[in-house]
């Protein structure tokens, strides 16, 4: 049954119905639509539209419908209803007859769907906060296991300076904490209730919108009916928060994919998150990580989609907004499964400490320490930088590490170099000297890890 039609003499074409109907997407708002309808029954009863018995019967029927349908999406999608609101109202009328037709008094699908979607976002946001926290905890557990494993840090994907694997883990903890903060901000801003805004001008009945908002778990009501029914900022913000977080997950996935290559062999991934080849028996592919990386582009596309949909819409509601849900649902689903997979991957990561240490020792990652040594001897840093560059070039030509060069060879570049230089070129010294807040010294990483573990 359509919720409109008196104005029309002709029937909608089958093609238009297929094009117009949103139930295959918005069926996911079923629980929220019923919850909003129960609260709305109380609201219109408070202003005399329903008597106490009518209100009680409507609420009982809605609760019964909620229990009957549960999570059986096929019971909704196969109904042939135009949208989730039509489905609920039709089922309600089947249960209580004409009384069901009174429920929509003073309410529009415009404020109804805006409310449903915000309720859904609130519930989904809470689940995503839990999933983000689980990835953080997995990173902290990995950092604890591999706290002092020495590895090369990279810039431009070239070995730069030695760091620890624990430090690498905590870098992604910082990123995911910002993701948590962004999500919390978005959830805070959407925590206002549009119900009672009507189609665009506000309901004609003197309901208490503060009470209605509280009944649905919102912090308060929205304050402008035009904005209330046409606002989809929360969709944009959640898609944006997901996009930034997916960027972080994709970067982490790329790091681990590289670390897992035969060329690096820094880590091994567990069997339960990898797959093989139908042709090459030896292959163990990092599919989980590659799919995280791949789904990032999909999430970005959904963000661009909703921004493009909203960019030129006049006030207030327009049917274009029906396109808000599919991308949002897909985005939060994709984000959620990627968070789950990231946590699972991290749980099974094994670090090959011998390989990471050998890689840190190669590539002249201790060159900065030699420059700092020269600075301590009184040489200006820019001059020291140039001298060490020459030393590195010489070492490359000899096929030797800096610490393997004879003292006489080093002194040929800078006479101030003494035999006390060699301890400064060790990996342990390179790490220990980064004993500053945020640095990679074991002492700093240990303290940072302990602080994070107290939080999570």
From Swiss-Prot:
SUPFAM superfamilies: L-aspartase-like. The gene is argH. This is Argininosuccinate lyase. It comes from the Bacteria. GO terms for cellular component: cytosol. PANTHER family: ARGININOSUCCINATE LYASE (PTHR43814:SF1). GO terms for molecular function: argininosuccinate lyase activity. Its EC number is 4.3.2.1. It comes from Shewanella amazonensis (strain ATCC BAA-1098 / SB2B). InterPro entries: Arg_succ_lyase_C (IPR029419), Argininosuccinate_lyase (IPR009049), Fumarase/histidase_N (IPR024083), Fumarate_lyase_CS (IPR020557), Fumarate_lyase_fam (IPR000362), Fumarate_lyase_N (IPR022761), L-Aspartase-like (IPR008948). It catalyses: 2-(N(omega)-L-arginino)succinate = fumarate + L-arginine. Keywords: Amino-acid biosynthesis, Arginine biosynthesis, Cytoplasm, Lyase.
